[in-house]
């Protein structure tokens, strides 16, 4: 892997991790079209660190408040809307953990094909469009009860199917439940913190036990590039989502999915 490849892959990861357009659909393009080799475990860990740092730093005030409220509810029995939201994020994380443990091998063996990614990119794009057009868009994230959190968590678990998009699935579920676009996006981004942490930790453990060589320059490129691109992406998405809605992302997903099918049929 060259520094240019490291930069491009980290940029793709940072830009697509938090937009409802599927990072997996984009990350297969360099290897499928340009023949780039797999970037390896170490680089995967690096871009997870970068994107995690971006969302934690962007929502640093909320993260500190939610952690404090969560611990206060555990050790002092205090109840607050912040503690409730923190517990809803915990509940929403559980389905993905279970699904990942049970279905990891099935996904890796049977569902990582370009045809699956193209199909899910289109189908979940259309679902996002339908929900965005018909949702009530009234509630904020603090109104989520455990049933809503579990529903969104199941959507996050299904997003492990390549091409679905974690942010796309969770935002779609939140919109369906009546969240405003901004609240759906914020809840999705806050939900990403524990799941990216767990995924990155799992990859880090695999890296340590694999003995794979580590190239510090590539890792720094991955961390810095994914951090900057993800941070800017979160900021711009939250600023623009209320007035532009989800239609631009739906159109992009349809073009991407059709383009992938066209490439596969001509290859």
From Swiss-Prot:
Keywords assigned by UniProt, alphabetized: Antibiotic resistance, Cell inner membrane, Cell membrane, Cell shape, Cell wall biogenesis/degradation, Hydrolase, Membrane, Peptidoglycan synthesis, Transmembrane, Transmembrane helix
Localization in the cell: Cell inner membrane
Pfam families linked: BacA (PF02673)
A GO molecular function held by the record: undecaprenyl-diphosphatase activity
Transmembrane regions listed in the UniProt entry: 1-21, 39-59, 83-103, 111-131, 144-164, 189-209, 218-238, 246-266
Family statement: Belongs to the UppP family.
Name of protein: Undecaprenyl-diphosphatase
Organism: Vibrio vulnificus (strain YJ016)
